[in-house]
Amino acid sequence: MIYQSPTIQVELLEDNIAKLCFNAPGSVNKFDRETLASLDAALDSIKQQSNIQALVLTSGKDTFIVGADITEFLGLFAQDDAVLLSWVEQANAVFNKLEDLPFPTASAIKGFALGGGCETILATDFRIADTTAKIGLPETKLGIIPGFGGTVRLPRVIGADNALEWITTGKDQRPEDALKVGAVDAVVAPEALEAAAIQMLKDAVAEKLDWQARRHRKMSPLTLPKLEAMMSFTTAKGMVFAVAGKHYPAPMAAVSVVEQAATKGRSDALQIEHQAFIKLAKTDVAKALIGIFLNDQLVKGKAKKAGKLAKDVKSAAVLGAGIMGGGIAYQSASKGTPIVMKDIAQPALDLGLGEAAKLLSAQVARGRSTPEKMAKVLNNITPALDYAPVNHADVVVEAVVEHPKVKAQVLAEVEQYVSEDAIIASNTSTISINLLAKSMKKPERFCGMHFFNPVHKMPLVEVIRGEHSSEETIASVVAYASKMGKTPIVVNDCPGFFVNRVLFPYFAGFNGLLAEGGDFAAIDKVMEKQFGWPMGPAYLLDVVGLDTGHHAQAVMAEGFPDRMGKSGNDAIDVMFENKRLGQKNGKGFYAYSVDSRGKPKKDVDPTSYELLKAAFGEQKAFDADEIIARTMIPMIIETVRCLEEGIVASPAEADMGLVYGLGFPPFRGGVFRYLDTMGVANFVALADKYAHLGGLYQVTDAMRALAANNGSYYQA
């Protein structure tokens, strides 16, 4: 053994080829400070051996290296620029040391080689992947750029255009795609991986492969004619900005770094990368996006822990077909859990099966599935007009019409047909789980399971704990949601649960602006373009449906009359009473039609303005700051109330619920990250300016105390 540490082992194989194996404790390899230090020491040990002729990098795990240890980032990025620069330079010195070894090097890549893992393989002369490999630089998704030489080496290996696509999108690349552009030199079967890498090194030692020319090219300026370079980078900037927009600076910074470094050798090019990396690491956007990644890990960790308590869900059932039932059935069946779809009407079953078939056909058309896989998924969905096939289900999801009496009747019925230990969940968006539980003989096996529409696209599922729900029930539904490919958060029962409870105060703020003559299209523009929501409030209400919004608003007003009660008609009432239901009937705040390509088209509708003018008088202009304040303050305060009341367990889970359930702008990180970035004291001062507007604008005592102590909701 040449070198050994808890994360890396180096041994000498036949023909004087050394093998460096990444094999950290735990399930995956990642670049934390300990592993970087071990790699540095391992390379020093290798350099001291006079007989080594080549080096192969391997992994003792199912994956190569998943990337840097992101849990270290927020603490590290909070350091002074000088400390951060020192860390980046020391890390890069290790990768340079690997690249400068006086003999050929190769990486044998299996599973993920992402971020720092990808930058490791780029520092070697040859790269051989097996068929399980996924290679990529996802750093821009975290608001930063690669910091271990990725922006320097990748363009010199696969060309600037290909490298910019990899870096700015942050997507994982399949081995065959990596081979096409030259990121890897061969793709082999998993069992042949190490032997293929060693053979390539033997060929390099025997001078059949020119490893020195390859290395020289990686360390030199890019070979791009000046005019071609100018055109390439100008085009890239336009394309990248069109996708990333002004709120996500990292992709544009990556283009700029690659462009500036194009004419430089390795040392100067790396300095350009270092400076851009540090600048981005200090941004609020990076903090927010890294925070989302860490929050996602926390939520997934909780779901994994729940799996230990959970009942194994081998089969499921959904009661109520149609679009929602069909979406749930599709999601369950496509992720491998067979499901019975039960309804009282054949046309509804046909609609549900049609919805599943439509989603699957779209996947086949895009090349993401095959007709054989489509048939298998559809065979996993069993339509039924009676309860007989439901009796074998481990979990039953009730998804009938959103009416308490109808739901209570269906829940009482199904309980008679299912097994004693079957779990029953209601896909309700507003009706109290404790209220529905009263219709059941065994309320301990009942909880809420709130999917968001469209089911196949929306990642969040709210699992609602009623006062009688057992831990096994909650754990089993969390595990089932995870198995369906969803991100579950557990919330306690209250009107609107978590997501709708915090959404409707936002709509109330919007209604307040319209009641004073605000222009809904102007408000949407501010909330989309400046705050960063995917849809402004008027457009979102049209998509949700004004009938749904009207009903949910009444539920919230009844549940929280002091804050959400109404004294008269608002804009939602005006639209609903005039049968303007939104996209579903082609007219809401906006008018909807289909363009020449068959795609939905949204237009401002003069009729909406006439109706609002008749109800609320002449239009009045509001500036962007006031629009943002009056819509967001109620949502933020209600989110804080949910945390204080224990409706949601942590700031992390609340923020993930907002990002995944409502599309809260990821670059802002969620309500609690937004509050910490703004400063709780600054927010309290802003809210106090609008406190005269009512209870929704009045901060809690605990918020005021936190502000007085200069506190924050996150520790980092």
From Swiss-Prot:
BP-aspect Gene Ontology terms: fatty acid beta-oxidation
GO cellular component labels: fatty acid beta-oxidation multienzyme complex
Metabolic or biological pathway, per its Swiss-Prot or TrEMBL entry: Lipid metabolism; fatty acid beta-oxidation
Molecular function (Gene Ontology), one example: 3-hydroxybutyryl-CoA epimerase activity
Region called 3-hydroxyacyl-CoA dehydrogenase, residue ranges: 311-716
Tree of life domain: Bacteria
Region entry Enoyl-CoA hydratase/isomerase, spans: 1-189
Protein name: Fatty acid oxidation complex subunit alpha
